[in-house]
Amino acid sequence: MRIFLLCLALSLSVFAATIKELTNVVGVRDNQLIGYGLVVGLNGSGDGTSSEFTLQSISNMLQGMNVKVSPGDIKSKNTAAVMVTAKLPAFARSGDKLDVSVASLGDAKSLQGGTLLMTALKGVDGEIYAVAQGSLAIGGLSPRPGAAGTHSTSANVINGAVVEREIPQNFSQSEDLILSLKEADFKTANNIERVLNTIFDTDIAKALDSRTIKLTKPEEFSHVEFMARVLEQDIAYTPESKVIIDERTGTIVAGVNIEVEPILITHKDITIKIDPNNTVALGQNEIDMKDGGILDPVSNTLKITNNKTTVANIARMLNKLGAAPNDIIAIMQNLKRAGAISAELEVI
């Protein structure tokens, strides 16, 4: 298995983005909904008799329809207990449709071909905000037996829920509106304040900290008109240098300009020596790894003399050496701990 490296030309570059892309409007957000339900119509791929909660749920459902049956008498494998989730968008109105996600709770083999029965979706306050029902769609299933496909124990119901209860909003009555930066940064917050005060020709924006910008709506604008104009403004910003590592998939995402300082590091049987001031000629039996790297196969030492050694260079060379993904990830983490990488390292 080789590690997958994705390099993005982000670090040390100045970009422009709209305020809408950089911020959230405080109070204007999605709300999570959850419910417990049953999927029926499965072709023998549902929960087995060991999932007692499924049998009890079937019994309870049938009793609600005046059909009395004991859970111990139910032998159906065409039903599965599932958890149903959805997001209730800001300003959603009664009758609006929502997409829902469905995931098996028991030991069902597959939800393919199933139908979700009427399921109440509740918020964190315990109130019912939507009701879901409909046929399940499982995307990406392989048509060939034995071929890899997606997880067949999770599915979606497109437009499968109907909003029954609205969340009260006071957006149009708010005198002050708050923007929250998705990535806290003093410079970006200051840029937003400066641009908005210039556009509106008055002090309507005040950066309170590295994330929060307070807005005061001018009387001549409605709330909707004001926010529409605010959110469309372009702001110059510099993305934070970051290296993201996904340990599960062996993926490293890094800006192409993220440099690594001179260092000597040994991991297992691999030694990496970064010394841009020491020009090393290709010796006997040594291998040119490109990217400014030379491999001594005897000592298994990778000597890097490139004036600008980057995370991308090192990852590529280690890949060529056949290093395991977990070894490459460990080396990156140790480089960060040693202070050779100044960018933020995020492991997911």
From Swiss-Prot:
It comes from the Bacteria. Residues 1-16 form the signal peptide. Its main location: periplasm. GO terms for biological process: bacterial-type flagellum-dependent cell motility. One of its GO terms (molecular function) is structural molecule activity. The keyword Signal applies. Keywords: Bacterial flagellum, Periplasm, Signal. It holds the Pfam family FlgI. Belongs to the FlgI family. The basal body constitutes a major portion of the flagellar organelle and consists of four rings (L,P,S, and M) mounted on a central rod. This is Flagellar P-ring protein. The lineage of its organism: Bacteria, Pseudomonadati, Campylobacterota, Epsilonproteobacteria, Campylobacterales.
